């Protein structure tokens, strides 16, 4: 049944010749002691050779144990036999017809929202007609709405009134202004009732009234100007705007004036969106541009959130200059930027080009008229080259209430381009577009004045719906997008109507597309920006919008550029391209049917979604594996279907399985979102007892008479097919000798059906098909896949998963279509126990010199002495061989074709990820290749039939090996190059993007996009009263287990060996429940938030950042090397900085890692170094134990601050001991373990939700705190990033 992957080259180990070293004076040596030593050395080497030689046999022993676990404990063989016997229908997917159907479904969704927007627009326009005869001016102020009118609403995640709307007012509102809000109430309420996925609805009036429904009490801090928000601006002026802001900071500008100018520039930045292009210049004696991206010197950049953030940083850093202002130089540069941008892009006829000049208008005393004339000559000439299409807007900065008339006249002449007044002849007969001049002082409301700059631009009366890109819903969960339209009465603009739509609902058909394993789908907008792609996290779980990334970076394969051009230019079409296997994407490789070929075909079929700006595309990898769908099945008579909602069903035999509500009576079935026809509806609505009864009746119905409660067609057959495993699992629960080590057994199908035993209550958002155990099994079909260790969200501590695919038909020759994945969770310590029991060599010297380990095919350790060592090395997730065995890692990198270092681009956090892939086609074993590593011998071989390797290390003396790892985060130490044979921990580098074009730098353009990250898992909190009343399902009787072997690895038990100080050995070790001594330390804090122990913080961290104890000599050597490395680094860094004219916030940070703390930690351990040698490697290395934090806003900001062209020498630049200025919000269970508290500031927004998210530089991100525990655990260190202002 098992099939080996064929695509990897077979690796044969280097031949190792074992011979005794030539001994001095042998034979007949005059000095017997030396001869005797040599003999002993030979004998030791021979013994090691014999031990080493058995590694292949030992691997076979482990393989047979893995096969036994998969067959007997999990039931893989039985399940495969059952699936072989079932009847299937075959289906080949047709991209062209599929894309039409899917586009139609998405169009219908958008049409519902367009209908809502159009209905609201009609009501507003009709109300205005009524207003002319009977004024509508009644105001319901959001700031004074009584709390009694509102109640909490889960859809909005805040208190709202679903019957009335309320208003926010701008400072300039006339008391008789048109306000249709009260007329709108009934229509808006009806819309909300009849449309799932709808969020906030609003009307923004041109007179300054913002009406929002449902009503919500905002914390009001002064006036609210909605008309300078991007959604309003892009709806009333939908044409693209090319804007250059020039900021005068010459000698004549006072500090007060400069501050007004800087604030005004920030307002302009916050009013535009990614459809516009922007540049900010400062002018005094010379012109400066923002240096955070080299392209800003040459082109305008799309006003994405990233560009606006960089420009905002630049504006904030502007300082007064001592030199007089050269107005002409500033305008010359501004026109150059506009011209180069127009030349490099396809010119659109309706693009508005604007220069906004924030200046005091003062010219030099000596040559005032010449300065003015020179400035207007530049404007006249340069605008002539652009057919006089550029408008100039000037804002006069008043100096303490006084502004000279000459200065105002000059600024008016600039705005009106009065070159004739200065005797300058016109270059072209085309008329100029006259702008306007406005005066600004300290009392000016900048949002109402400068923020409304667009009113000077021509109103082309475009009455079309505008779709925003996704942004965070600051009041609720997830991402939203806005659909808006302008309202007119004749030619009079009344304002805009808008509706916020839940992105998860709009994209559900794309997110959960499951036609076949060989196909997937993506959605882009008409500019090529990606809204949804398989390598993006589900929108339901996103708290921040993905970076606006072009589809070309996700589909990074040769010839896709031509496909992209066709997708954007043709409303309907298809195209096939041939891709060499060595240029392929990882998610293509997993979908290939014939892995031996050098190339494969990819078929793209696309369709424009009618009435929107979005394009849907379906991708099929050819030749594809035909999809096999089960024919109608009947349920197994003996099996009882139990839905996982035990809390609703009132199960009499309920118990607690650690922290989960569970039952031992039968497995439970959970249907994840992908099982439903409308996944969003399932996720957003609470399940009721009645719904659960309907599901159960439908799924158990052999008569086929009960109506489908909204499930996909194939789900019932999958539920019935998986029910065959129930009897086997129940029998094993009674008979198996391993029950004390097994946490749970489960089986999942591609449509998201999960059957689990013991039957457990699961979180509604859980999707088994996106978990690592599932993805690993699918990537290794027919093999036993090992995943972990990871902290079990259900409360069982650290677990390791064995998973295996089940196929539609499986023969010795080939595995068919994957129809299910089975998995079983064991305790982490059980795996180490297996290693010790089955490989006596690991125990033969009490573990002093010989260490054994198991690692999976990415290099992460599944079993290793330090993972179970209570002294300073608590079990940790994501521990890599480079962390724990650097000497082995250094050596195996030199074996040809065995290990490959991979790069991929992660656009969710804008990083380049470096990882390892080990060749599972290894034949034989590997041993030391590099001469000179006499202190440490290792042997490594694959465990046949699995994705894992077993290794044995024999260390006879201290040796020094170095793998480059950051001490405090995941930053690579050298981001300039990656050598295949250089040892470094899995790490990440900033992804360098050219902000003006959205393209990556050339080197990174070749990297594939990373696959989707593992999603965080939450566990459903149960009623505390119920928790106290229920017994544990499994009682391990830890207190009755007297021997270490009887306690080690048993469910919920720990063998307590270390006292509560984290260092002292107990006089008498004993067995206790996990919460009493987690990790073997008495009183240690559990990583679970609700199991707080009594130990101080210094022990809880469990010395997570420590390396092994350093002896005096090795410590000295290490110190010297570190000093030398840092000295060279500092010297090169200094030289490098001088060679650059700009500084980046990252490259110029202080080198502020507190190495002293790390050294002190190491010294504390020195006392114990002898007694620790039994379990801990004496190899010296620097280890990073920071796991990747998938969506931390802090990490994103850290990387975003980079230039697209700057260098990075990569040593960490963060202070681990200081508090972050913007601590990331966090409800991780592990955070309790390292005592990093929650930082959810209670954010009650001053701005209504749908626009607040667009002011990202003003608001911290906030997500509500749910009583849930996340499962993707990350060690978090509070840090401060020392940024340096980007002076330009």
Curated annotation (Swiss-Prot):
Residues 1210-1229 have a biased composition (Polar residues). Glycans are attached at residue 159. Residues 1-49 form the signal peptide. One of its GO terms (cellular component) is membrane. Residues 50-1109 are extracellular. GO terms for biological process: calcium ion transport. Its main location: membrane. Residues 1157-1176, 1187-1237 are annotated as: Disordered. It is a single-pass type I membrane protein. It is found in: Membrane. SUPFAM superfamilies: Sensory domain-like, vWA-like. Residues 1159-1174 have a biased composition (Basic and acidic residues). Belongs to the calcium channel subunit alpha-2/delta family. This is VWFA and cache domain-containing protein 1. It comes from Mus musculus.
């Amino acid at each position: 049944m098992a099939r080996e992957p064929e695509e990897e080259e077979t690796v044969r180990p280097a031949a190792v010749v074992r011979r005794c070293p030539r001994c001095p004076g042998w034979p007949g040596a005059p000095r017997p002691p030396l001869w005797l030593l040599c003999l002993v050395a030979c004998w030791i080497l021979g013994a090691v050779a014999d031990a080493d030689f058995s590694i292949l046999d030992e691997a076979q022993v482990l393989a047979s144990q893995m096969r036994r676990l998969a067959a007997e404990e999990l039931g893989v063989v039985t399940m495969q036999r059952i699936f072989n016997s079932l009847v299937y229908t075959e289906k080949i997917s047709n991209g062209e017809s599929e894309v039409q159907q899917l586009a139609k479904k998405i169009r219908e969704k958008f049409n519902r929202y367009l209908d809502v927007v159009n209905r609201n627009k009609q009501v507003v326009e009709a109300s205005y007609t009524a207003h002319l005869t009977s004024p509508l001016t009644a105001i319901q102020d959001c700031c004074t709405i009584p709390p009694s009118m509102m109640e909490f609403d889960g859809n909005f995640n805040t208190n709202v009134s679903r019957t009335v709307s309320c208003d926010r007012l701008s400072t300039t509102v006339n008391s008789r202004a048109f306000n249709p809000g009260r007329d709108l109430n009934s229509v808006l309420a009806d819309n909300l009732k009849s449309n799932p996925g709808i969020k906030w609805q609003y009307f923004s009036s041109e007179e300054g009234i913002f009406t929002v429904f449902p009503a919500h009490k905002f914390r009001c801090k002064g006036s609210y100007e909605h008309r300078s928000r991007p959604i309003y601006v892009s709806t009333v002026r939908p044409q693209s705007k090319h804007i250059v802001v020039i900021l005068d900071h010459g000698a004549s500008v006072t500090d007060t004036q400069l501050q007004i100018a800087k604030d005004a520039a920030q307002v302009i930045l916050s009013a535009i969106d990614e459809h516009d292009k922007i540049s900010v210049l400062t002018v005094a004696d010379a012109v400066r541009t923002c240096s955070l991206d080299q392209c800003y010197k040459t082109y305008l950049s799309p006003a994405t959130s990233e560009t606006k953030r960089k420009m905002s940083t630049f504006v904030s850093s502007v300082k007064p200059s001592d030199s007089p202002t050269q107005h002409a130089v500033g305008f010359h540069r501004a026109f150059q930027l506009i011209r180069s941008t127009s030349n490099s892009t396809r010119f659109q006829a309706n693009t508005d080009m604007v220069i906004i000049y924030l200046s005091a208008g003062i010219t030099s005393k000596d040559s005032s008229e010449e300065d003015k004339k020179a400035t207007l000559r530049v404007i006249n000439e340069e605008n002539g080259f652009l057919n006089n299409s550029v408008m100039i807007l000037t804002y006069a900065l008043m100096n303490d209430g006084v502004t000279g008339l000459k200065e105002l006249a000059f600024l008016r002449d600039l705005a009106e381009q009065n070159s004739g007044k200065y005797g300058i002849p016109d270059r072209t007969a085309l008329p100029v577009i006259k702008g306007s001049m406005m005066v600004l002082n300290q009392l000016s409301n900048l949002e109402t004045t400068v923020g409304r700059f667009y009113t000077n631009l021509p109103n082309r009366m475009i009455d079309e719906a505008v779709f925003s890109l996704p942004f965070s819903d600051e009041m609720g969960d997830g991402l939203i997008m806005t659909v808006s339209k302008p309202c007119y009465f004749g030619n009079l603009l009344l304002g805009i109507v808008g509706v916020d739509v839940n992105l998860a609902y709009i994209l559900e058909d794309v997110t959960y597309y499951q036609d076949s394993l060989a196909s997937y789908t993506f959605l882009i907008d008409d500019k090529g920006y990606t809204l949804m792609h398989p390598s993006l996290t589900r929108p339901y779980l996103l708290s921040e919008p993905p970076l606006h990334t072009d589809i070309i970076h996700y589909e990074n394969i040769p010839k896709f550029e031509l496909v992209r051009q066709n997708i954007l230019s043709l409303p309907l079409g298809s195209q096939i391209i041939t891709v060499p296997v060595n240029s392929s994407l990882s998610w293509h490789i997993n979908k290939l049917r014939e892995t031996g070929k050098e190339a494969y075909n990819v078929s793209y079929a696309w369709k424009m979604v009618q009435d929107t700006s979005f394009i849907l595309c379906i991708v099929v990898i050819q030749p594809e594996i035909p999809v096999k769908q089960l024919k109608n099945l009947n349920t197994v008579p003996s099996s009882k279907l139990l839905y996982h909602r035990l809390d609703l069903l009132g199960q009499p035999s309920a118990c607690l399985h650690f922290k989960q509500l569970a039952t031992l009576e039968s497995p439970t079935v959970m249907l994840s979102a992908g099982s439903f026809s409308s996944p969003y509806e399932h996720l957003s609505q609470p399940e009721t007892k009645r719904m659960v009864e309907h599901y159960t009746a439908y799924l158990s119905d052999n008569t086929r008479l009960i109506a489908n409660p909204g499930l996909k067609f194939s789900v019932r057959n999958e539920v019935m097919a998986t029910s065959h495993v129930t009897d086997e699992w129940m029998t094993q629960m009674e008979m198996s000798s391993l029950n004390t080590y097994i946490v749970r057994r489960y089986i999942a199908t591609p449509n998201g059906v999960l059957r689990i035993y013991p039957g457990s209550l699961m979180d509604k958002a859980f999707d088994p098909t996106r978990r690592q155990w599932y993805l690993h099994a699918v990537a290794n079909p027919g093999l036993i896949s090992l995943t972990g260790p990871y902290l079990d969200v259900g409360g069982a501590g650290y677990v390791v998963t064995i998973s295996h695919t089940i196929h539609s038909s499986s023969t010795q020759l080939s595995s068919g279509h994957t129809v299910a994945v089975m998995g079983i969770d064991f305790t982490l310590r059980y795996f180490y126990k297996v290693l010790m029991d089955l490989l006596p060599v690991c125990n033969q010297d009490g573990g002093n010199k010989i260490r054994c380990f198991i690692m999976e095919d990415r290099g992460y350790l599944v079993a290793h002495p330090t993972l179970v060592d209570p002294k300073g090395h608590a079990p940790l997730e994501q521990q890599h061989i480079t962390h724990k065995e650097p000497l082995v890692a250094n050596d195996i990198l030199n074996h040809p074709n065995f290990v490959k270092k991979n790069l991929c681009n992660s656009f969710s956090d804008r990083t380049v990820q470096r990882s390892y892939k080990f060749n599972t086609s290894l034949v034989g074993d590997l041993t030391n290749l590099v001469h000179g590593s006499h202190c440490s011998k290792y042997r490594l071989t694959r465990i046949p039939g699995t994705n894992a390797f077993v290794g044995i290390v024999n260390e006879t003396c201290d040796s020094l090996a170095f793998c480059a790892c950051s001490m405090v985060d995941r930053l690579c130490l050298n981001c300039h190059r990656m050598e295949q044979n250089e040892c470094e921990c899995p790490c990440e580098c900033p992804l360098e993007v050219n902000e003006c074009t959205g393209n990556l730098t050339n080197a990174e353009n070749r990297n594939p996009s990373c696959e989707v990250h593992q999603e965080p898992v939450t566990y459903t909190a149960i009623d505390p009263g119920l928790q106290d009343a229920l017994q544990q399902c499994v009682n391990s009787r830890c207190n009755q287990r007297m021997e270490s072997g009887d306690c080690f690895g048993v469910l919920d038990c720990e063998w307590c060996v270390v006292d509560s100080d984290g260092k002292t050995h107990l006089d008498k070790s004993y067995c206790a429940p996990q919460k009493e001594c987690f990790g073997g330390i008495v009183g240690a804090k559990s990583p679970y938030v609700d199991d707080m122990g009594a130990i101080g913080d210094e022990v809880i961290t469990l010395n997570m950042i420590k390396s092994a104890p350093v002896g005096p000599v090795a410590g000295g050597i290490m110190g010297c090397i570190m000093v030398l490395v840092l000295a060279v680094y500092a010297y090169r860094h200094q030289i490098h900085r001088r060679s650059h004219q700009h500084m980046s916030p990252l490259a110029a940070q202080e080198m502020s890692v507190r190495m002293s703390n790390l050294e002190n930690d190491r010294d504390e351990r020195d006392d114990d170094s002898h007694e620790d040698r039994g379990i801990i490697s004496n190899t010296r290395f620097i280890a990073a134990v920071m796991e990747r934090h998938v969506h931390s806003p802090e990490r994103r900001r850290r990387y975003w601050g980079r230039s697209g062209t700057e260098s990075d020498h990569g040593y960490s630049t963060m202070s681990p001991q200081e508090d972050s200025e913007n601590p990331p919000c966090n409800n991780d269970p592990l955070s309790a373990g390292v005592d990093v508290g929650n930082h959810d500031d209670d954010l009650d927004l001053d701005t209504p939700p749908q626009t607040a998210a667009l002011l990202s530089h003003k608001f911290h991100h906030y997500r509500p705190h749910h009583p849930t525990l996340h499962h993707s655990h990350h060690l978090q260190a509070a840090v401060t990033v020392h940024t340096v202002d980007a002076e330009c």
